[in-house]
Regions:
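Active-site loop-to-helix junction immediately N-terminal to the catalytic Tyr of the SDR YXXXK motif
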Residues: 43, 87-95, 107
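Alpha-helical segment proximal to the catalytic Tyr-Lys
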Residues: 68, 110-114, 172
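Active-site helix of classical SDR
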Residues: 63, 97
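Substrate-binding pocket helix/loop in short-chain dehydrogenase/reductase
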Residues: 39-40, 44-52, 132, 140, ...
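Short C-terminal tail/terminal secondary-structure segment
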Residues: 86, 164, 175-186
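The beta1-alpha1 cofactor-binding region of Rossmann-like NAD(H)/NADP(H)-dependent oxidoreductases
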Residues: 3-13, 45, 157-158
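A conserved structural motif in NAD(P)-dependent oxidoreductases
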Residues: 148-159, 170
Length: 186
């Protein structure tokens, strides 16, 4: 099932389809995201709105649904970015959307008190995905890769392992946290 989670009705349909198919929802991973790089003064209203609609409002829509439908003992994992800590030029709007996600996650972890639902963020550093590499020069990609003490880009599997841990029973005691899976870049 695909949906534009920034649209409330589509987010509701997505959640309803999951409930119908599986009977319950134990884990929500909010991974939808868009990024338009530009300086703040050059950011168009359209780019600003699209990033906030998908990256923040989409997460909000799914969190609102999960807070009422997620099973006791469930987990919510929201994807953020280590750019929130790096404060790189041209990432201002994108980082702002993800900072909002981190704040909502921490607050929701407290609002779900007594439901035994863990809410966390995973904040990847530069990871070799289409979203990261699109529109960037190889020189810039190499520069970011070398900022990490591990001197490489993260791989999708590096991030998936952290998400899997947080979704597992072993990771359930972790709650209200931002895990910066970035090879030490921040």
């Amino acid at each position: 099932v695909q949906a534009d989670v920034s649209k409330t009705t589509q987010a509701e349909s997505l959640f309803a389809a999951a409930l119908q198919e599986f009977g319950k929802v134990d884990v929500l991973v909010n991974n939808a995201g868009v990024m338009a790089l530009s300086t703040l003064n050059e950011t168009s209203d359209d780019d600003f709105n699209k990033q906030f609609d998908v990256n923040m409002k989409g997460v909000f829509n799914m969190l609102r649904l999960a807070s009422t439908h997620l099973n006791q003992g469930g987990s919510i994992i929201n994807l953020s970015t280590s750019v929130v800590g790096l404060k790189l030029e041209r990432y201002g709007v994108y980082a702002a959307t993800k900072s909002a996600v981190e704040t909502m996650s921490a607050i929701l972890s407290k609002e779900l008190r007594g439901k035994d639902v863990a809410v966390n963020c995973v904040a990847p550093g530069p990871t070799e995905t289409e979203l990261f590499t699109e529109g960037k020069s190889q020189e810039f990609i190499d520069k970011l890769a070398n900022m990490s003490p591990m001197e490489r880009l993260g791989q999708p599997g590096d991030i998936a392992n952290v998400v899997n841990f947080l979704a597992s029973d072993e990771g359930h005691w972790v709650n209200g946290q931002v895990l910066r899976a970035n090879g030490g870049i921040v």
